[in-house]
Regions:
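Membrane-interfacial helix termini and adjacent extracytoplasmic/periplasmic loops
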Residues: 90-108, 166-200, 269-272
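Periplasmic/extracellular loop-to-transmembrane helix junction in inner-membrane transport proteins
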Residues: 81-124, 144, 292-303
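Flexible loop/hinge segments at secondary-structure junctions
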Residues: 1-91
Length: 311
C-alpha cells in the first residue's frame, strides 16, 4: 500500500518479513543514490549507461526497492513493479496523513481533514447557538418595535457580506488577538476558524429563529400571562416549544453554512493537514482542502479521485 511504501523509504520498515515476505533486509535505492554505486566513467557521458547500471543493480541486489523513472529499467521483465496509483478504503478513512505530493507514495488519509472539520464546526456551533438564540429571544419578545426595526435589517445585511471579507476580518483582528491572548507562536488556529464561522452563521440563526418565534399566536402568550406566568416563563414554556421546528431549521441552516464554508476558513486556520490535539492548533477542513488543491490535481489521477471522494 502507499503507506507501506512510505514507511519503507522512511526506514520505518526495514525487513521484508514485516510485510509478510522472506526474512531479508530491505535496501532502498533512489536515483540520486546511483553515484554511491558507480563512478561517472561507468555511467558514461550524460549518464548514458545509467539505465543499464540501475537494471544491473536491481537484478543483482536481493531485497532492493528502487524508486526511479521507468525509462531507466532496461529489462522490465526482470523486475517487479509496485503499483501505488490505487487508494484503498482503509488507507483513506483510517490514514493519519494527507500528503498528496509525497514521493515515492502519495498519502491520502482523510482523518486529519475530517477531524479538523469537526473541531471547527463543533466549536462554531457552541459559540453561535447560545448567542444566536439569545438575540432571537430579545428581538422577538423583549425589544420594542423601534429597536427591532433598526436591528433586524443590520443582521440581515450581515448575511450578504462575502466570506472573504469575514476572512480578512478574522486575519486582521481575531488571529492576532488569539495569538496574544494564549501566547501562541501563530494565531492561525481552529479557534480562529470557529469564531469566524460562528459570526458568519449568526445572521441565519437569528433571522430564521426570530421569525419562528414571532409566529407564535398572541393568544397563547396572553393565556400564559393570564394564568400567572412571568414573561420569561412564557418564553420558556410557551413560545420556544411552539417555535421549536423553526428554531431547529435556523440552527440547521447555520450549521450547514459553518460546515460548508471555504474561503474564510482557508484564511484563518493555518491549513496544516495534521490531526489537531487542541482547538488552538492550526488545522485544515475538507472544503478548504478541495478549494486549495482541486485546481492543481491532474484530472483522473489518484489526487483528483481522493478530492472527489472527500467532497
Amino acid at each position: 500500500s502507499p503507506a507501506q511504501i512510505k514507511n519503507v523509504f522512511d526506514e520505518e520498515i526495514t525487513n521484508w518479513k514485516e510485510l509478510g515476505g522472506e526474512d531479508l533486509p530491505i535496501r532502498v535505492f533512489r536515483l540520486e543514490d546511483i553515484t554511491q554505486y558507480y563512478t561517472e566513467e561507468e555511467l558514461g557521458p550524460a549518464y548514458e549507461y545509467a539505465g543499464d547500471k540501475i537494471t544491473e543493480l536491481v537484478e543483482k541486489t536481493p531485497g532492493i526497492v528502487a524508486f526511479v523513472p521507468q525509462k531507466f529499467i532496461v529489462h522490465p521483465d526482470a523486475v517487479h513493479f509496485i503499483e501505488d496509483n490505487t487508494i484503498s478504503v482503509k488507507d483513506v478513512f483510517a490514514g493519519a496523513e494527507w500528503f498528496p505530493t509525497a514521493t515515492p507514495a502519495a498519502q491520502f488519509g482523510f482523518l486529519p481533514l475530517i477531524t479538523g472539520t469537526l473541531w471547527v464546526s463543533l466549536f462554531a456551533i457552541l459559540f453561535a447557538l447560545p448567542f444566536g438564540l439569545s438575540v432571537s429571544i430579545y428581538m422577538s419578545e423583549v425589544a420594542n418595535p423601534k429597536v427591532r426595526n433598526w436591528l433586524k435589517p443590520i443582521i440581515e445585511l450581515l448575511s450578504g457580506i462575502p466570506s472573504v471579507v469575514y476572512g480578512f476580518f478574522g486575519l486582521i483582528v481575531i488571529v492576532p488577538l488569539i495569538q496574544k491572548l494564549f501566547d501562541l507562536p501563530v494565531g492561525e488556529s481552529g479557534l480562529a476558524g470557529s469564531i469566524v464561522l460562528a459570526i458568519m452563521a449568526l445572521p441565519t440563526i437569528i433571522t430564521v429563529t426570530e421569525d419562528a418565534m414571532r409566529n407564535c399566536p398572541r393568544a397563547m402568550r396572553e393565556a400564559s400571562l393570564a394564568l400567572g406566568a412571568s414573561q420569561w416563563q412564557t418564553i420558556y414554556k410557551v413560545v420556544i416549544p411552539y417555535s421549536i421546528s423553526g428554531i431547529t431549521s435556523g440552527v440547521v441552516l447555520g450549521i450547514g453554512r459553518a460546515i460548508g464554508e471555504t474561503m474564510a476558513v482557508l484564511m484563518v486556520t493555518g491549513n496544516a493537514a495534521v490531526i489537531p490535539t487542541t482547538i488552538l492548533e492550526p488545522l485544515r477542513t475538507i472544503p478548504a482542502t478541495i478549494a486549495a488543491e482541486l485546481g492543481e490535481a491532474p484530472a483522473g489521477g489518484p489526487h483528483y479521485q481522493a478530492l472527489f471522494l472527500l467532497g
